[in-house]
């Protein structure tokens, strides 16, 4: 078991979430095999965080989000030989979006998703490779 990590303070985790230039964010629907890298913007309101992002997903993932809006986002930031991993559990909502550009398949399209985290946990790993702690692989 790899114990070479430190827990991130909440303010550091939020700072990392807001710095989207250095991070890779992955969206997973509860019980879904899909892990989709996404581009996102963060917005703080009333002390809470809300992420709005556009992602290319197929119809099946969109349907899963609409039927069960419990989602997990995992943000990974690699910096100075350390890996910060922030796991956010919360709810997703697909927003109306005029963009219907096809991406990987004809059935795929870009959708705008609003993610509201309910629980945020973060860890910073040292030089050793971290164990796979992705919320996608529960």
Task: Tell what function each PLM region has.
Residues 1-19:
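Extreme N-terminal tail/first-helix region
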Residues 7, 27-29, 75-81:
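A short, aromatic/hydrophobic, helix- or strand-capping loop or linear motif
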Residues 17-21, 67-70:
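A short, compositionally biased
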Residues 18-19, 32-34, 85, 106:
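Short solvent-exposed loop/turn micro-motifs enriched in small/polar/acidic residues
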Residues 20-57, 63, 74:
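Short beta-strand segments
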Residues 45-48, 56-119:
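Short, structured beta-strand-loop surface elements
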Residues 122-138:
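Mixed-charge, glycine-accented linear interaction segment located at domain edges/termini
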């Amino acid at each position: 078991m790899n114990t070479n990590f430190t827990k991130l303070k909440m303010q550091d985790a939020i700072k990392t979430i807001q710095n989207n230039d250095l991070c890779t964010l992955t969206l997973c629907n509860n019980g879904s095999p899909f892990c989709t890298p996404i581009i996102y913007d963060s917005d703080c309101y009333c002390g809470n965080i809300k992420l709005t992002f556009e992602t290319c997903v197929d119809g099946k993932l969109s349907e899963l989000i609409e039927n069960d809006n419990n989602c997990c986002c995992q943000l990974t930031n690699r910096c100075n030989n350390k890996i910060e991993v922030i796991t956010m559990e919360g709810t997703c909502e697909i927003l109306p979006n005029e963009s219907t550009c096809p991406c990987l398949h004809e059935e795929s399209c870009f959708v705008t998703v609003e993610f509201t985290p309910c629980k945020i946990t973060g860890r910073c790993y040292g030089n050793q490779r971290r164990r796979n702690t992705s919320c996608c692989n529960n």
